[in-house]
Amino acid sequence: MTIMKIQDIQKFIERHFNSDIRAKKVLHAQSGSYGSFPENLNPELQHILAHNGIQSLYSHQFQAFSNIEQNKHTLLVSRTASGKTLSFFLPIFNEYLDSKSPFSTLLLYPTKALSRDQESTFGQLMTQVKKSGKLGTFDGDTPRDERQRIQRSADFMITNPDMLHSGILPNHNRKWKSFLSRLRYIVIDEVHMYRGSFGSHVSNVFRRLKRVCSIHGSSPVFICSSATVGNPGDHVKALFHEDFVVIDNDGSPQSKRNIYFINPPLVQSEGHALYRKGPAAVSVPLIRQAAKNNIRTICFCRARQEVERLHRAVIDGNHELASIVKPYRGGLLPSERRSLERDLVSGKIKVIITTNALELGIDIGDLELCILSGHPGTVASFWQQSGRVGRKGNDSVTVFIAKDTPIDQYLVNHVDFITSAPIEQALLNADNPYIFLQHIPCAAQEHPLRSEERSFNQMLYE
């Protein structure tokens, strides 16, 4: 297997698909903005950062530390691979190391892949701290004995809104009283995912969580992060019914990105009808070229069936690629999913073909090439998916391949609609009566409702 540079892939694209390239956009590299360590940062944490090659913080990390330290609800908006995990890890652990009575922290992630990835990242950081708390992941894959251990002794727990709704809040008095009574921080990553009907339900789950925390004597600080949202301040205000400090001046450096917009050619059938070839006419040879030349690649498809079809087409007649080109989709067993994630991070897998299951901020290594088989549906998802590559500071390439649909055909011929358009706003309405009223019985089961309550005021449901 030869070693190929990302510049060679660009030459391959421009040579083999020259007549099909509708546009090329170049996002030039940007330098970062840095700040020194906070004066009150624990020396042990300073040593850990230095040991990991971190001599300074990005400006947004410094701001986040300052605001969280002042007990302010904080929203951090920055692009992928900008150190968001470190932004909340530092202030939380800085307080944890100095605290005489250990507190608990709840970390919420929208997908299992992201939860397991952050469990690994957070766990690695925690192992370097002498006064290390107990970390656990509470989701549908967690065995019964592990769940009991988490309930008894966890200081840091990773979970998701579904488990919060169905597993934690209904049992807050019997199983979670210890954890909730000392809950100090709630971290919500990828907060832009909580929008629409789903976000409205999640907002009411947070209403119930704050109510239960108040019953147990805790008043946690919310820390949120997002890479792509058009109305960050308004969104978190609607989601949590709290005022937030919004930090949106991203101080991380940006590597150079080349984005190609390709429209597969029109061909004539035997009946002389014109039709456009599918995205596979471009993605199959491109994936094969990348895999054979050691270019680490991710290809996004809209549906599971498309993932499987594309994978079969790539390895058809090229069975030597079967071990380094793999499909990733929903419906896999937990063991299969984690095995794929490990092999992807280690570099054993060179190309992963996936649905949007890997769209969010899971650290999947130093990828160089991103292929989008059709428009993902929103401008936010376009940038989220293309942001999977170039995370380690290296140049990267994104290839958008249009399908023969009205939306894709419009976008491939009007690329400024994507590259210059603002990110969509995330909207929700937690007071929608059809949603709000579904949470009233849940809240009443968790603790008797009273007319003077602020979270579930009687006026809202009369």
Question: Model-flagged regions — what are they?
Answer:
Residues 104-118, 287-315:
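Conserved strand-helix element at the start of the C-terminal RecA-like helicase core
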